[in-house]
Amino acid sequence: LEGVCETVRDLYAERAVCYFRLKKELSKYGVRILRADELTPRQKEEARTVFMTHVLPLLSLMVLDAKHPLMQFENMKNYMLYDLERDGRHMVGVMAFNAALDRLYRIGGGEKARLVPLEELVRAFGHNAFTGYTAGGRMMMRVTRNADFDTNIDDSDVERDFSEIMKKKVESRARLNVVRLEIDREDEKLKEFVLKL
């Protein structure tokens, strides 16, 4: 496992280098992928409108507290977590991303394309969905769940319907143990919460 972790760490670093190289190359052709903090005030207002009208209606929200302490996080699905406070009580706000949402949203017109990733819109404006709460830290997360595949499948089973066997195995993954947790930044309260998964 240590070898896997070391290799994965290197692959994540390589992925980041590729992403920034691609971003730089795209900007030469007038396509810019922007973080929310890079937007002008006018662009930020347009991005907020895009979030409120096109993104927010497709997000699933939940507030976890002492009465509702945990939920089942789906395999390979993105979530934004918020450290929420109301009347001196701390809670965790969970915003689940819908697969129907676009991954990039164009802001502004003209020949040059300014694109804001879905994750940036949620990070910048998602706290508005939790009315009545004060939002503190926020953290994007995704879990990978274990998949137990039996290599001793009888040949007659495979001949009958291999796709059905695989479908059942993949579906069972939704209930299995978390083997990887990905977060985009460390917020101590939220990190403490997700480590209980």
Task: State the predicted function of each range.
Residues 1-197:
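N-terminal non-catalytic structural scaffold regions of very large proteins
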